[in-house]
Amino acid sequence: SRQIGATWYFAFEAFENAVMTGDPQIFLSASKVQAEYFRSYIVNIAEQYFGITLTGNPIRLSNGAELRFLPTNKNTAQSYSGHLYCDEYFWVPNFTKLNEVASAMATHDKWRTTYFSTPSAKTHQAYPFWTGDEWKQGSKKRTAIKFPTFDELRDGGRVCPDGQWRYVITMEDAIAGGFNLANIEKLRNRYNTATFNMLYMCVFVDSKDSVFSFSDLEACGVEVDTWQDHNPDAARPFGDRPVWGGF
């Protein structure tokens, strides 16, 4: 579900592991902005609980641990290795490429890979990876193997036949577990059923119900980092040159 603190939780987990073991931690996010959320959480955790000011990217701890925060469009990302966290992977364009890069970064048995995200569309490249269909592909023996049901994945998570541990946390589950920052009945009343289910009940959108397919929208995307004449931190990002505007 959205807004239940998953990014903060994994930021704390990674920081704790870095402090206790000295292992490198790598954070891959759908965008540079999302990657900065991870970094800001860790900086705030260190300041709030330990009175330590962390700076830089990567963040380097006194025990040698490095914490790197990267958007998925960084082609140099695969040169690093360590425990890997992939945030909002159901919203990452070209997930297949991301998964290849992620696999290379966490090849060694000692490294752990954690994927987590809110759901998007069933046509997203990551959907077969989540359901296990990608693992079953090309093998009659694997095709007959059943994966845990949605309800079973909500019940504390399960280790699945492909070796992955999967866990679904809906807003209902979060509230039952002590989350008290949202009123689920107000949320149900605010949205139509389909929107509520996608945002808070971990239900994927079926593209047949959409005006545009997710793949069509993906094709319209652009990597802003490739714009050599654009400075997002400037008062006038494109200087005094003419630009097209749209919505």
Tell what function each PLM region has.
Residues 1-13:
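Walker A/P-loop
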Residues 5-6, 34-35, 76, 92-93, ...:
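Flexible loop/turn segments at secondary-structure boundaries
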Residues 22-43:
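Conserved Walker A/P-loop ATP-binding site and its immediately adjacent core
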Residues 31, 71-73, 116-121:
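A short beta-strand-to-loop transition that corresponds to the Sensor-1 phosphate-sensing loop
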Residues 36-82:
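Inter-Walker segment of RecA-like/P-loop motor cores
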Residues 43-49, 53-62, 93-184:
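ASCE P-loop NTPase helicase motor core
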Residues 87-89:
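Walker B catalytic acidic pair
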Residues 156-247:
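ATPase catalytic-site recognition across NTP-hydrolyzing enzymes
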